């Protein structure tokens, strides 16, 4: 599975939405703002679904992963396959969202 992971940069998080669930993020900020996110991983990983990604990036972190353990408010972008798109790590599972990756910091 070819993925990218984005995490909120605390220096850009003026509305304090890091680690907030999707509903609270939308209530506080009105959107999931890609401009406050930084890309912390981009590679092919040995995962079949988002639950595998969550496990891997909490228990078996790859050496090229520069972020914290995968948490609520992080965004996982799947770059290939039928589930291609951006997914918000929510309190329970993942939710597909609109996320302009070109606005996030690489």
Please name every model-derived segment:
Residues 30-80:
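Short, conserved turn/kink motifs that form compact alpha/beta structural patches or helix kinks used as
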Residues 1, 102-106:
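Short intrinsically disordered terminal tails
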Residues 6, 37, 57, 87-88, ...:
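Aromatic side chains
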Residues 12-18, 56, 61, 84, ...:
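Context-gated lysine
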Residues 22-27, 97-98, 106:
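Short, low-complexity, polar/charged sequence segments that are solvent-exposed and flexible
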Residues 45-47, 89, 105:
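Generic recognition of cysteine residues
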Residues 66-103:
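Short, compact, well-ordered microdomains
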Residues 1-45:
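Extended boundary segments
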């Amino acid at each position: 599975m070819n993925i990218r992971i984005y995490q909120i940069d605390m220096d850009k998080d003026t509305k304090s939405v890091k680690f907030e669930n999707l509903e609270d993020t939308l209530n506080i900020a009105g959107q999931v703002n890609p401009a406050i996110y930084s890309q912390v991983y981009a590679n092919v990983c040995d995962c079949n679904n988002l639950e595998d990604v969550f496990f891997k990036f909490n228990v078996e972190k790859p050496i090229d992963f520069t972020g914290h353990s995968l948490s609520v408010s992080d965004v996982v972008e799947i770059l290939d396959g039928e589930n291609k798109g951006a997914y918000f790590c929510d309190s329970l599972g993942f939710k597909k969202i609109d996320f302009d990756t070109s606005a996030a910091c690489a």
